[in-house]
């Protein structure tokens, strides 16, 4: 799988990625196409397949308390609950910025504590939850794509 920087890519990138064996494209619900051409937006849903046969894996839960305090524990658990109530997989987006302490040790410690609390809350609320990598989720989606179960 791959994710384009800042969620900016176009069809040419998808074609090249497919040629080198990339099956899954990670991103948000909204994709910005190349700024070299007039910027335009495309919208994707979890498990959508493109013309190259690749699947989109859309990030739908966010743990980004360093960037925006409202994107911490409560919001992430709420978004995850919404996904699970709809029988959809949850992909949690987070970045190392939330967990490094070089500049702000308190930030690292607080966010590591909150992320651990989030994982514990998920397991407590959903004891049969499965954690997997993006590639593993992509494999599940691609296997289920042509069955009655749609992601």
Region annotations inferred by a language model:
Residues 1-86, 91:
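Active-site-adjacent pocket scaffolds in enzyme catalytic domains
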Residues 19-40, 91-151:
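C-terminal domain-boundary segment and adjacent tail
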């Amino acid at each position: 799988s791959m994710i384009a920087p800042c969620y900016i890519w176009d069809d040419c990138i998808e074609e090249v990625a497919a040629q080198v064996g990339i099956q899954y494209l990670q991103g948000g619900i909204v994709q910005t196409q190349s700024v070299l051409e007039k910027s335009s937006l495309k919208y994707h849903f979890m498990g959508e397949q493109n013309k190259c046969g690749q699947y989109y894996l859309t990030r739908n839960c966010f743990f980004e308390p360093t960037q925006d305090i409202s994107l911490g524990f409560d919001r992430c658990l709420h978004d995850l609950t919404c996904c699970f109530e709809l029988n959809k997989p949850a992909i949690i987006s987070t970045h190392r910025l939330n967990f490094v302490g070089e500049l702000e040790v308190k930030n690292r410690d607080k966010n590591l504590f909150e992320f651990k609390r989030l994982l514990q809350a998920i397991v407590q609320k959903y004891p049969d939850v499965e954690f997997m990598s993006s590639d593993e989720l992509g494999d599940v989606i691609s296997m289920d794509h042509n069955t009655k179960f749609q992601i």
